[in-house]
Amino acid sequence: MSRILIRNVDAITLDEQNRVLKNTNIAIDGKTIVALGDVPRDFAERADEIIDGRDHVALPGFFNAHVHAPMSLQRGWAEDLPFDRWLNERIWVAESALTEEDIYWGAALAACEMIRSGIVAFADHYFWMDQVARVVEESGMKALLAWCIFGLGADKEVGRASLERTEEFVERWQNAGDGRVKTTLGPHSPYICSPQFLTRALNDAVKLGVGIHLHVAESQAQVARSLKEHGKTPVAHLASLGVFDVPTIAAHCLYVSDDDIAILADKRVTAPHCPKTYLKLAMGIGRVPAMLARGVNVALGTDGPASNNTIDILESARLTTLLQKNEQRDPEILPSMQMLKLATQNGAWALGFADSGVLRVGARADVILFDFAKPHLRPRHDLAANIVHSAHATDVDHVIVDGRVLLRKGKLTTLDEERILREAERRAFRLVGQEMRPIREYQH
């Protein structure tokens, strides 16, 4: 295991006191932060790598709590459409032509983008997840992986998948990659999956000792349909089935009542917020302040590149706080330090990496460095505000995961970026250039 010393760096710790340390040192031994501030005199002599932190700001790495990483192949393919047509005319059609190899290269392209933007871990929800797990192993990132399943029969599933097949994936990959790969079950949503199928998925999750990741309450139409079919909101419906009795990531939760929010809080459900997708598809902006006030674990996600077009948690943080400040007519809500916690430790807890998301002795060494020697990041009155409101993803120039450097001075160390760019684009053009067919239909 290697030893890394980051010298003379400013650090946003995101600890309980929200300490910001100036001109400090961070010592990493193996996977763990072993010193913050004063470092043992002989550590520098024994260090395998010394990083000059002058003009840099360190903070915990970002966690993407909801993404469809291989959809990077569909970036720019489904533009300027409402949600139903976006799914029915573009996304679910293109997915009928996907291959396992497409998934690998799409996930690899996404991994390049995520590492470059300071994302150290992601919760992925897509198909052929063995291929995504391969990318996680090779890249050095962390992930919570869910194989998406609809429960509509093999002819309506990508790759003719089944719940049994997704269970086998869980058993193969849980805690692989030296603990960096975690798994969960991925029934798509209560508006696609029947109550019987959701109950089967829940029982299997309990048997396997894992959680569930699904989409919840993305539109008013979904809520109305749930009330008509089940007599309950989507959140209440899932709670009545017992789905929230296992660790649950309920992506979006845009249309939730006060009673729904109470359920989410009481069941410790994570609600990832993906604002750029909501804006692009004109879906709404959600009730983030109300959920946080009630104690819901709101984390940040990006959703897939087909609806967001980028995989940038910093952008999600910025849009979330700006939209909610404007919606609530309250400039004091969701301050920068809180947004950084949503982007880091809230996601870390949701993905099962609770020992990350903070800079302190004993925490996992998941650290990113922003290069602050830039005009748009000076002066440094408020480092957290500079990052949330001024920084770009391209300002990240070091990424460390479990004590391993994945990005050094802006260069990827674990992935062949040139080859990935070439192969991913070739496969993306092939994907949309062949015969495709709708394999299921989204109905309001």
Predicted regions and their residues:
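Divalent metal-coordination and catalytic microenvironments
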Residues: V9, I26, K31, D55, ...
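His/Asp/Glu-enriched, well-ordered alpha-helical/loop segment
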Residues: S240-P247, P289-K374, S390-A391
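Alpha-helical scaffold segments that flank or form the walls of functional sites
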Residues: R75-M141, L163-A176, E425-M436
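Active-site gating loops and adjacent loop-to-helix segments of metal-dependent hydrolytic enzymes
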Residues: L73-W105, C112, S139-A161, Q220-P247, ...
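Active-site microenvironment of metallo-dependent hydrolases
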Residues: M1-T24, I28-D29, K341-H444
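Metal-coordinating catalytic core of metallo-dependent amide/deamination hydrolases
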Residues: Q131-L254
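Active-site glycine- and acidic-residue-rich loops that bind
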Residues: A123-Y126, T184-R200, L279-L281, A350-G352
